Amino acid sequence: MISSKTSNRICLCSPQQTARITGIVVSSRPAYLTGLGYPVSLRLSSAVSQSSSQHTRSFSSTRAAHLKDFFPVKETAYIRKTPPAWPHHGYTEEEMLAVVPQHRKPGSLSDWLAWKLVRLCRWGTDIATGIKPEQQVDKSNPTTAVAAQKPLTEAQWLVRFIFLESIAGVPGMVAGMLRHLESLRRLKRDNGWIETLLEESYNERMHLLTFMKMCEPGWFMKTMILGAQGVFFNAMFLSYLISPRITHRFVGYLEEEAVHTYTRCIREIEQGDLPKWSDPNFQIPDLAVTYWKMPEGKRTMRDLILYIRADEAVHRGVNHTLSNLNHKEDPNPFVSDYKCDADHQRPNPALKPTGFERSEVIG
C-alpha cells in the first residue's frame, strides 16, 4: 500500500504477522504462505501507525527516507515521461459489473485436454500459494463457485496475484513471437493477430507491476516464479508450434480461472473479510490510477480488482474465439473493420465468456 505519509519495509513471514502490522486482529498461531512449509517474505509499502510499530519487534523496518521504489523511474536530462505503448481504453462501471465467472464446456478431446491441464495448474498454484482445504471453493463447480468456508488474507491474495500475473504475461508474448516469425517465413500478413496477443501480454504485465507496488516477493517466491516462468514459457512455445488451437483454448480456460479468482476477491472485500482493503483510506498505486484512467471517487481496492477482472474477461473471450478460427487464414475479428451491416459489427470479447464461433465473426 502506497502512502504519502509513511512507508515501512517489512519482512513478512506469515499472513498472521501481516495482520499484526496492519492492526487486524487474528490468532497468534503461526502459519506459512506456502504449502511447501517455507515462509514467503514480502516487502510491503504500508501506512503504519506508531501504536502498531511498537508491537512488531520481530520485523526489520526501514524509515521512509531510506525506502526506495521497487522499480523507480530513472531520471534523464531530456526525457520527462514514457507513456504506455498500449494505452488502456477503459471500462464503464456497468461493463465491469457485468463480468461473471463462466465456463465453456469442452466440446472435443483437445478441449478436454486443455481444460484438465488448466485444472492441474490450478492445483499446483493452490499448493504453491498455501491455499488450505477450508479456503477452497466447491470442487464440483471450481470455475464458478466463489464461496469458501474461510476467506484468504490480504497477504495470501497478494502472493497469489503476483504468482499468477508473473506467468500470465507469457502466453501472449510466446504466441505473438511465433506468429511474427511465421509471418516472416511465409512472406504473408498476420491479419492482426500479433498486435492483440502482444497487447494482452503487456496488459498482464501491468497487472503484475501494479501488485508489485504493494509488495515485493522474498527469495523463495522469486525462485518459484523463475522456475514456473521457465517451465511455462517452454511448454507454451512447444504447444503453440504443435497446435495453436489447443493453446488458445488452454489460455481461454486459464483466463476463466483468473476471472473466478478476482470475482472471489471482490466478494470477500464486499463482505468485509479483508478489512485493510475495505478501509476507505487505503490508497491504490498511482500506476494503476494512471493506466486505467480511474476517476476520482473510484480508486478503492475493489475498483482496482474490478478493472483487472474486466481485463481478464476480455482475454477469456479473445482466446476462446481465436481457438475457434483458422489460425493461418482468418483475420483477427477484434481489430478488423466490418462491412456496413447492423447484424455484423466488431465483437466485444467481454460480452461472450465462451468465445464467438467462427460463423459469428468470420461468416
UniProtKB/Swiss-Prot annotation:
It is found in: Mitochondrion inner membrane. Fe cation 1 binds at residues 165, 204, 207, 312. Its main location: mitochondrion. One of its GO terms (cellular component) is mitochondrial inner membrane. Its cofactor is Fe cation. It is a multi-pass membrane protein. The keyword ATP-binding does not apply. Residues 1-66 form a transit peptide. The chain crosses the membrane at residues 158-178, 224-244. Pfam families: AOX. Disulfide bonds: none annotated. This is Alternative oxidase, mitochondrial. It comes from Podospora anserina.
